[in-house]
A protein has these predicted regions:
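Catalytic zinc-binding patch centered on the HExxH motif and its immediate surroundings
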Residues: 210-218, 239-256, 260-283
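Beta-sheet-dominated interaction scaffolds and their linkers
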Residues: 50-71
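Short pre-active-site segment immediately N-terminal to the catalytic Zn-binding motif
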Residues: 169-173, 277-303
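Solvent-exposed loop and capping/linker segments of extracellular ligand-binding repeat ectodomains
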Residues: 1-50
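Propeptide-to-catalytic entry region of secreted or membrane-anchored zinc metalloproteases
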Residues: 133-250, 421, 426-458
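Surface-exposed binding patches on compact interaction domains or structured appendages
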Residues: 51-53, 73-101
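A short beta-strand micro-motif common to beta-rich folds, especially ectodomain repeats
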Residues: 110-121
Length: 463
């Protein structure tokens, strides 16, 4: 049975602890017991604990005018003892738990300060540190990374999550967004058809930096979080609502716009959320793994493959027939939507979606029928030995390239032509050669890859 105060069984328990420069807080009813107890009485300042906390304890913002919410938990009446002159609170005093609006006025340089709250009946305080960082763009400001030169313009939006004002002021955020854009276009056919896209980003400031998980909580702009079982999750409605503020994005073209969220983490584990109407959010972490499971591989597989191309996974997890798996229903669902052109449930040469490539001399050296895909070794077929949709290599198969180009033409308001496709098609043979030399085929995929998730209907913001 425990005692209060806890017995100090070793006289050296607090050795090295400075006992005169901080206050030891304990429940009020046992203050005198602690002051008299062996070991504990060595602390020079022992006082009653009071309930007064501010959430968050730290606010970071850019130097434009901005607002943040604070929650003050107090056991009684409280007041603001002091604050920076460039900070305004919606209330300077109150009673018990209170939600406050903190307004930070615009500034021109870095500055920091402290807001101190005090319980009125006690000499007891808590604080919130406030930082304001100098940056050339404001919170949520939309930036154009590229304007289209061909067609009517296809929206491609890169946003980060888990980047706080300090990260952004250092230039980390914009550097990452530009790098992600270049990775997206560093694979065919996107490299060739790059001029069809309008590319945007916006200064999405998160209260905290990093991404949370099961045992870690992070307050971020879009709520991106790692889970144990279903990959990355986010606040999809918040993301769509945010993107709809970009002038060229509207209800009529949201389903043809691709959103790429880059969580501020080097962990692997990308995933794409897709809606039946075509809307998509690709979560693409900055993986620190080696090729082909690096950040480039995730963007090209998740964003370029799933999010825009509507391609299916070709990697294998299970040595079994797909007919025995509940995922067969998901496969057929995708097929009914006109997706997954790179996969087939039949191995008959004249019935697969890529039949026109098999006997075409320009493609017949690599295009055939290979069994295995959609996580299963049997009952599902792919067109080439290896591709980006298997293990993230920097190469899309011929049928995948065609499916992507067809979608580009559709969204750009142009008519697709197979002859034009072939004329402009670039295989990327160097990357294909690298894949066949360095990688294994038909083996299990990296352990924490997640298939895309299909949601019914349209995003709820459009309903």
């Amino acid at each position: 049975k425990g005692t209060i105060p806890a017995d100090v069984v070793d006289s050296r328990a607090f050795e090295g602890v400075p006992k005169d420069n901080f206050t030891l807080e304990v429940p009020e009813i046992v203050v005198e017991q602690y002051r008299a107890a062996p070991g504990w009485r060595e602390f020079k300042r022992i006082a009653a604990h009071r309930e007064l906390t501010c959430r968050p304890t730290m606010v970071k913002a850019l130097n434009g005018k901005s607002e943040r919410k604070l929650i003050l938990d107090a056991e009684g009446e409280w007041e603001v003892e002091s604050k920076p002159e460039w900070c305004t609170l919606s209330a300077m005093s109150g009673n018990k738990k209170t939600e406050l609006t903190l307004t930070l006025e615009s500034g021109t340089n870095y500055r920091e300060g402290e807001i101190i709250f005090r319980l009125k009946d006690y000499d007891y305080t808590t604080s919130c540190r406030v930082y304001q960082y100098d940056f050339e763009y404001a919170d949520d400001e939309v930036l154009v990374l590229q304007n289209h030169k061909v067609g009517q313009g296809i929206n491609l939006i890169f946003l980060g999550d888990g980047y706080d004002a300090e990260d952004i002021s250092r230039g980390d955020y914009l550097q990452v967004m530009n790098e992600q854009m270049e990775r997206f276009f560093a694979i065919e056919p996107y490299r060739t058809y790059r001029d069809y896209f309008d590319v945007y980003t916006a200064i999405a400031v998160s209260p905290e930096n990093g991404i949370g998980g099961v045992n870690t909580i992070r307050d971020t702009k879009f709520g991106t979080t790692f889970t144990n079982d279903v990959g990355l999750l986010g606040e999809y409605d918040e993301i769509f609502a945010y993107v709809m503020k970009i002038p060229s994005v509207n209800e009529s073209n949201l389903s043809q716009s691709l959103i790429v969220i880059t969580p501020n983490t080097t962990d692997y584990g990308g995933i794409t959320q897709m809606w039946e109407d075509g809307s998509a959010i690709a979560f693409c972490p900055l993986s620190g793994d080696n090729y082909p499971y690096d950040a480039r591989g995730i963007v090209q597989h998740e964003a370029g493959g799933h999010g825009f191309g509507k391609l299916g996974d070709e990697y294998i997890y299970y040595n079994s027939f797909i007919d025995d798996c509940l995922c067969l229903g998901t496969f057929k669902w995708g097929k009914a939507l006109g997706w997954y052109e790179n996969l087939s449930l039949t191995g008959k040469m004249h019935e697969v979606p890529w039949a026109h490539f098999i006997f075409d001399d320009r493609y017949s050296d690599v295009v055939d029928i290979y069994e295995g895909g959609f996580t299963h070794t049997r009952g599902v077929f792919r067109s080439e030995q290896n591709s980006c949709m298997n293990n993230n290599i920097q190469y899309h198969s011929a049928i995948s390239r065609e499916a992507i180009v067809k979608r580009i033409m559709l969204y750009a308001g142009e008519t697709y032509s197979f002859d034009e496709f072939v004329k402009n098609d670039k295989r990327g043979s160097d990357n294909l050669s690298r894949s066949t030399r360095d990688m294994d085929f038909g083996t299990k995929a990296r352990g924490n890859q997640y298939p895309p998730v299909i949601h019914k209907g349209r995003p709820s913001i459009l309903k």
